[in-house]
A protein has these predicted regions:
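Short C-terminal tail/terminal secondary-structure segment
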Residues: 235-255
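Active-site helix of classical SDR
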Residues: 119, 153, 161
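Alpha-helical segment proximal to the catalytic Tyr-Lys
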Residues: 124, 166-170
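C-terminal substrate-recognition "lid" of short-chain dehydrogenase/reductases
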Residues: 125, 213-241
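Substrate-binding pocket helix/loop in short-chain dehydrogenase/reductase
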Residues: 95-96, 100-108, 205
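Conserved glycine-rich cofactor-binding loop
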Residues: 8, 15-17
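Short, small/polar-rich loop/turn modules that mediate ligand/substrate recognition or access, typified
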Residues: 169, 174, 235-236
Length: 255
């Protein structure tokens, strides 16, 4: 029997990419999942892919009222859960001098504030001994031009991971983060990116990643499930899944 059979999870930002891959892996193994998103077309497609053990719910991570409503839906449909994967995110790169207050606030509202309050409001529904996994980013500590608000918001989530891990120790709830590098997803993690921008972003990613390729959403999903269910003596950790990019390692010259 699968390790994940009967497990119940909530995946925010779960209608495409890494979130959907994680939800599909759980459902395939006999689990039951609620995924959230804002795009109606993506919600419908995710519901179709996940089938009867999946529940696609419209929810905006930036709105605390939506997070509270999500808690009620989770309690009604799943009761207690084994995993909360806080994956909803927003990225819109731009030079430091061009960042607007609106962009800054939106980025932090979704990536930092939304992540924090999703964990806070749903923690009472997590079983003792369960897991919270946050999505951070290789941008946390890389100093890449144009990534100011995004990098800052994800660095905040890295800090939340440690603090919440400490606070939930009495309940034996482990709190960890997965830190993706360049990953093949429909949006490449960039909100509103044009096809030309995505193509350029992919080329850069392959060039600077030591393993010379993008990761897949399924590789992120495996990392999430490892941290959630198999890494039973690990908490407060950030697992890099980035082809060596975050470790600043270099390929042998000429290879």
């Amino acid at each position: 029997m699968s390790t994940y059979a009967g497990k119940k999870a909530v995946v925010t930002g779960g209608t495409i990419g890494m979130g959907l891959a994680t939800a599909k892996a759980l459902v395939k193994a006999g689990g039951e999942v609620i995924v959230t998103g804002r795009n109606e077309k993506n919600l419908e497609a995710a519901q179709t892919e996940l089938g009867p053990r999946g529940h696609a719910v419209r929810s905006d991570t930036a709105q605390l009222s939506d997070i509270d409503a999500l808690g009620g839906i989770v309690e009604e449909k799943l009761g207690e859960i084994d995993l909360l994967f806080v994956n909803a995110g927003f990225a819109q790169p731009g030079p430091f001098g061009h960042v607007t207050e609106e962009l800054f606030d939106t980025t932090f509202a979704i990536n930092a504030k939304g992540a924090f309050f999703t964990a806070q409001r749903l923690a009472p529904l997590i079983k003792d001994g369960g897991s919270i996994i946050f999505t951070t980013s290789v941008a946390n500590d890389s100093g890449n031009p144009g990534m100011g608000p995004y990098a800052g918001s994800k660095a905040a989530v890295r800090a939340f991971t440690k603090v919440i891990a400490a606070e939930l120790l009495p309940r034996n709830i482990r709190v960890n983060a997965v830190s993706p590098g360049f990953i093949h997803t429909p949006t490449a993690g960039i909100t509103g990116a044009s096809p030309e921008m995505l193509q350029a972003f992919e080329k850069i990613g392959d060039e600077i990643t030591p393993m010379r390729r993008h990761g897949s959403s399924e590789e992120i999903a495996r990392a999430v499930l490892f941290l959630a269910f198999d890494a039973t003596f690990t908490t407060g950790e950030e697992l890099n899944v980035d082809g060596g990019l975050g470790q600043r390692i270099n390929r042998p010259q000429g290879q």
